[in-house]
């Protein structure tokens, strides 16, 4: 899906569910990692995570667009547009928009280190300075072994 198709889809959803036009820009943002989308308060644009569309399809994307359009229309009307506001929660229920999107992070990278003396393995999310840190069991030197990618269950 291109940004132009996304713009048309957003305008269509806005008219169908909110009976109001969407007059700003909707676009994909590849830098979004942990969120499905965001509404920009200053420019009134909507940015969406393209990975959500690639992984979960058009239905999930439509749900995220509805969620962001709730923020958009409530903000423009001067009503409560934040997640905790009553107006926002009512609009989510009325339009069938999800409160949360499916997780954007399906993969997790784990670094594996091993002790050169006792062969104990360490699994870490962050890099270890092997010049500074040693094995907790025998105080031997640590050596980088490999990088694993773990897939989370759905």
Swiss-Prot record:
Cofactor (UniProt): Zn(2+)
Sites where the protein binds Zn(2+): 67, 71
Major site of localization recorded for this protein: cytoplasm
Pfam family, one: SprT-like
Name assigned to this protein: Protein SprT-like
UniProt-annotated catalytic positions: 68
Signal peptide residue numbers: none
